[in-house]
Amino acid sequence: MNRPKREKKSITDVSTLKSLEQIKRARDGEKRTDQLQEEDDERKRLEQLKEQETEFDKEERKRKNRDFIEGDSGYRETSDNEDEDEDEDDDGDNSDDDYSLDEDDEDGGGDGENNDSDQEEAIEVGRKKKRQVKKKSKKDENGEPKVKTPRVKKTKEKKNEIVPEKNRIIQFINNPTESKSTSNNESFFFDKLKKSNSNTLNSTNSTLNSNELSSGGTMSSLDIESMLNDLQSAPDSELDLEKLKEKQLELEKKLEKEALLNKPTISTETIITEGVELDDNYEFDFDFNNPITTNNNNNNNTKTTTTTTTTTITNKNLNKVNSMSLPTRPQAQQFISPKQTNQEDWWSKTGVDSVVLVKKLEEIMPKNSDLLKMNMDGSLDFFLLTTEEDKQGRIILFGKVKLQASKSNKPGGGGGATKQTSITDEPVTKVPLKYASCCIIIEKMERNVFFLPRDYKLDQDGESTTIQVTDTMIEAELKQLVDRSKIKDYKLKKVKRTSAFDYSVPHKNGPVGEQHYVWKLSYPSNQMVFPNDIKGSTFRCAYGITSSPVELFLIKRKIMGPTWLTVSGITLNFDQKKSFARYEATVKSFKSIKPSMYKNEPSPPLTVMSISTKSVMKGSSHEVVMISSVIHESISADGPTENQDSIKYITAIRPLTGQVFPPDFQKPGASTTKQNVTICTSERNLLSFFCETVLNADPDVFAGHNIIGYDIEVILDRLEKLKVMEWAFIGRLKRSSFDRFNHISGRLICDSYLVCKEFLPKEKNYSLVELSKNQLSINKPEINYLSIEPYFETTKKLNIFIEINENDCYIIFLLIFKLLVFPLTKQLTNLAGNQWDKSLKSNRAERIEYLLLHNFHEKKYLLPDKIYQKSSSSGGGGGAKDKDNHAAYSGGLVLDPKIDFYDRYVVLLDFNSLYPSIIQEYNVCFTTINRVKRDDGKWEEAMPPPSSIEKGILPKVLHGLVSKRREIKKRMEQEKNKIIKAQYDIQQQAVKLIANSMYGCLGFSHSRFYALPLAELVTRKGRENLQKGASIVNKMCYDVIYGDTDSLMIYTGVGTFNEAETIGKEIQKKINDQYRGSVMEIGLDGIFKRLLLFKKKKYACLKEFRIDSTTTKCERENKGIDIVRRDYCDLTKDIGQWVLNLILGGEEKIALFSLIKEYLESVQQQIKDNTLAVEKFIITKTLSKQPEEYNDADIQPHVQVALQMRAKGLHVQPGEQVPYIITHGNSSSDIKEEWHHRARAPSDVESIQDVDIDWYLSQQILPSIQRNTGPIGMEPHELAQWLGMTGTKYQKQFDHLQQQSNQDFKPRYTLSTEDLRYKQCKSFNFECPYCGQNNEFTGIVKIDSEGKSESGFDCNQCHAKIPLKKLANQLQLNIRTYLKQYNDWDLRCTECEKVSKNYKETSYRCARPQCRGKMIQIMTSSKLFNQISFFSKLFRNDLSNSDNTTTIIPNEDQNTLKQAKQIIDSFLSKFDQYNVNLNSLLTPSQTLDSFNNYLASSRASIQYPILNK
């Protein structure tokens, strides 16, 4: 068997490149690190072999010495006499055996010669094994005889000797870099650099021409080992390593220049489109070649181009559009450190203090109260952060306490304090205070249940008797109930309460505002809870059962969010603590806690720990490989944080399973070694270290981006599966069993993903990359989760991996600082009185709930039951949904938009806080308005109470909020201190958010304070006020072109900003005159210089506003259009943005058409040339639930891609934006898949050829451009042609529109489906009795291919006239088909789209298991009416621009129309909506005929746009 020879290493091999450290050691004559390592490895190997040597090894060694000999070709078996002719078949290639033979040959060769018996036994064993090997080797893998091949005997090669040159490195340093001829030594280093950058250069450039080498020898013959050995044997202390580094840098620059010269160039065609400045808030990614030159002269005809887009569109009329070209595909992603981006190097600002010291639990916990600051009366000042309830019914408070200021030391991780600025008049302590975490355990908390007595007692059968209920009777029954429930330590007394709310339990409802005597039962919270619908013979119902102990504690003790509390009667615990807080105390009763007298004292600083977790998939589990944390111990909760750079950071990382780190990673003394990085040996060790770090840092808040949906979930899952002993350290409460639902007790969680969704509603993408770019102007590098493994290949990549993860933690702090998350959410919580962690999770419904609970409890009202239902909705002005998902009441009024392009000024008027103002104006409250249900279960329409009724609680609360905000804003204007001014601004924002959310609790069906009649009253009054405002505008002879809920758009027709502003203020004053002495008020919200109004809630405008008295500025604003929607690709958005910029830029219509034509043709050319980037076709859509929970996943492309991503091990959670591209699909299949089955993740799309361009053109690009250009009169078929869509499917649709001679017929006969009512209607098809052709009837007149008009009743194939009776018969059959569908009452599921008549009787839900869809009727009465009305519209005989219809329509067709009209009307007459008396719409001086004549004349005067080429 031949030993494989080791290949000689070439100096140009990347694997043999040596570092400067090796050269340095060789220069000093020392052994190099690789030599030392090899010697250690060899020594360890020999020692291990000797230790593992056994008797079996000795026997095996004897056999090998007997049966194997060493020849020229290595080891081979000895041949017996009977097998000499088959000697070649015994050739082997087992490297492991070869390795063993080396050792055996050296130290075991003589054993067989001294022992004859062992020798004979070994011979026999060897021969048996040889025969078995021969039998196997004679056949191949398929069992066929193996063909013998003669073995070629290899000759032993001799190594090429290299003449030692100890000065070659010195010669390399002294030679000039720019020399044309490269020396032997320079070639070595130059070659080395080229090899290390082989991914950017062609392999042909990695070696130098042999003619350029000196006569000393060729590069291929040089050996780096020989060079270093020469230097090591003859040390040269004068070798300058710094010069060597400089020389290497020069060669790197030279290499980069060579790479640029060899880099392929991609040319793109551009069109000259000059003159309009573009919006830089939108990412064009266009390539602008020349800088723009501006000139204030309007008559300047100089062609200009621009280098960037701009958010401001100037008032100047420009004639041409900027030159631009769409981008090419970017290069592959590289490993980029955050330090190489535009972000500042925050690591350099940290010092030795940035290292987190990890100590044992007993080292960081205080042993006594010496450092704790107590009050003179023995009470303790405690700042509340969060509240928990344990299984025993105890209340546990977590917060912070003050430490003695005179003591210099403090408990570890307690959080350093900074000087806080107060906005109160109280003096600020100059001595910096120190704080530590604390836990307060309330041993005794109680529940309160209120029993409402009956008027008459019930008998045993539940029937009412004539016996009146007395106090003695009800008290006796309640005591029996308590004894039966084994409740102890209770109190029972009679109290007075008022009812005002609606309950889900019917027998709880009572008259509004009526006072009752009820029996209050107070008992410990750790005992049983009564059923919510409980009733007895002497009591009708019970209230307060659903209130939790935490809720009662906050309400009864009047605790309004995070604030200072005074705790008396405490017992400090230092042994057998129940928490990991630094201090722990116990109180007997909740009454020992009350708000502090100094509740306005500055809040203690927060210790915030942001974390970022990286994991790899193994099976279905995420295995954690790295956790980074950045810790800030002094974040202000009252205002901006002053010292934002005072941070600590730490990273724990482990090697991938089955691998090791690179040898020089975190090597002691190395320049790349990081002091804040801890290497862990396993995942279990990493998680244990992380938990210990949390214990030492003791953070008050965990922060992270999607930390709730990913980081915490992954960490807890791995802690549980790996059974990490320290798992409880992640929270502040000691636990003996794992609790996934209450895992981080005592610490707040700030998820920047949820926070940004609430406070940055205009963002389109809430990924950390996009938020960093848009909010912080930072180009954050992103880790490819598909390939984390490559980061572990080298030390450099590992360090980049760590830096990116640490940087993610730091960016979270930057977002927190910018949005002032903690001060703002604290103010919101202080106003509402709820818990801080719920405000951080953007639970807006709970804020209003607690605000009203505090107010109604203070007035002694019976509180409504708590609703334990999940819903993603939060209510709003659009009308709530009932249980069948229908609108329970009408929302805001939306006036029909007058779709057009307005190139003169439009003003926007907006009611200030419309719904809160209505609640105050009309005294809308639970306590002032009776709600009555009809017999059918629906609510009667509520009416405003009389003015004599006292103001309700809702109007009072809102009035208090509005007054408070007004006062805060007044103080803010007078304040000079920037920090205090920022605090005032935070407070007024919080008040505004609370006030504007008040209406939501009325209309949100899952709200605790849901009151549908009140919500309907508010929206009804909103509609009335908007309609009243529109009427006033019309009386002033201005045109209301659109209105929505609380705003009006008014066309002024003027051409200057000042004139428009004057008109707007005039209209504002006129409307506000109707509300004198009222809180209702309308304001001038905006002035639009140009407006493209598409449809309801969709428009684009150029908004102009005043900077100072003489200067104005314009900005683009889009609402609801395609370029702001996530489900449109960037190419569609770019084109749409360009077109809108052009239209709003003030160009003449003729110029617009030509410029748009040129631009679209250039886009077409780039599509043909495949020069567009694949990324331009990415569509994103939000995943609303788990991918497996979708019943219609097969037709949802983003769900399909999400499932594909999960199959690859990617983490996809609800709420994430899923990107995908529509491709050609499976090219091997002859049948093309549906488009939703051809969706792929962007990483799976290799090139532009894989993208289905036709789908994007027809489904995204063309419809978007058509909508944007529709108001200016551009035709869809021309747009399609300019985009290269010349296929028959587009041509058939638009060919007949090109005939100018028949333009008059277009509005009536060719575009009859444009009415939104008929969008889903099907056309009438009739069969020709002569040729059997199926014809679609589009109108009484149609245009043929030659532009001639012909009857719509003629066959398209044989052009024969369809007989009248045949047509009438087919029309009746067609209508009866739809009638049959209606009468059959077929239902279709909204989720799985199953058609059936079966459904769940109570809820109309789908009968299929696991399907949550609702069964809806396929053919409803409204659909049937619209369908038949559509037929009526098709058979109308009035032409839009012709006074004499008889000259166009033949008599024969007139008779056909008449009979068809009679058939259709006979069906329509059966519908109620068809028989409408229009006389009610007329004035006394009008008649129906005169009104019809007026409509006909108005219709004839309409001028339809004609395309000017």
Swiss-Prot record:
Region ranges (Disordered): 1-162
PROSITE patterns: DNA_POLYMERASE_B
Alphabetical GO biological process terms: DNA replication initiation; DNA synthesis involved in DNA repair; lagging strand elongation; leading strand elongation; mitotic DNA replication initiation
Chain intervals with Acidic residues compositional bias: 80-123
InterPro entries reported for this sequence: DNA-dir_DNA_pol_B, DNA-dir_DNA_pol_B_CS, DNA-dir_DNA_pol_B_exonuc, DNA-dir_DNA_pol_B_multi_dom, DNA/RNA_pol_sf, DNA_pol_B_thumb, DNA_pol_palm_dom_sf, Pol_alpha_znc_sf
Zn finger spans (CysA-type): 1328-1358
Entry's EC annotation: 2.7.7.7
Pfam families assigned: DNA_pol_B, DNA_pol_B_exo1, zf-DNA_Pol
Domain of life: Eukaryota
Assigned GO CC terms: alpha DNA polymerase:primase complex
Transmembrane segments: none
Localization (cell): Nucleus
Catalytic activity: DNA(n) + a 2'-deoxyribonucleoside 5'-triphosphate = DNA(n+1) + diphosphate
Binding positions (Zn(2+) 1): C1328, C1331, C1355, C1358
GO molecular function list: chromatin binding; DNA replication origin binding; DNA-directed DNA polymerase activity; nucleotide binding; single-stranded DNA binding; zinc ion binding
Enzyme class of the recorded protein, top EC level: transferase
Database matches in NCBIfam families: pol2 (TIGR00592)
Function: Polymerase alpha in a complex with DNA primase is a replicative polymerase.
Misc remark: In eukaryotes there are five DNA polymerases: alpha, beta, gamma, delta, and epsilon which are responsible for different reactions of DNA synthesis.
Protein name per UniProt: DNA polymerase alpha catalytic subunit
